[in-house]
Amino acid sequence: VGHVLSVHEGPASISKRGDVALEAGMVLSNEPGYYQTGDWGIRIENLIVVTPAKQTGFLEFETITLCPLDRRLIDKTLLVADEIGWIDHYHRAVYEQLHPHLSPIAKSWLEAACRPL
């Protein structure tokens, strides 16, 4: 993840062109999206850090951008159970990590934004 120069600075990236091995401590962007050809697109962007996994010799990602997804843009009828579960799990993590640092008003907003789908 870049600063000032380019949003996608190397050395590492998750792409077909990526030829640099990931190492613990590297920060990347996770950008799943959908694009309707010739019309519109939507993308969710979170920053992730590479961390050692509990299983020796493996790596995993930890999301470090903690912001709820805008529920107004989610059509639950288009999601399968695993996708709903992922969003609910993500929102629980966002709430648990952020709410201790917020004012009562902000905490109330976050609780509503992070409620299960």
Residue ranges and their predicted role:
Residues H3-L117:
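Charged, cofactor-coupling segments
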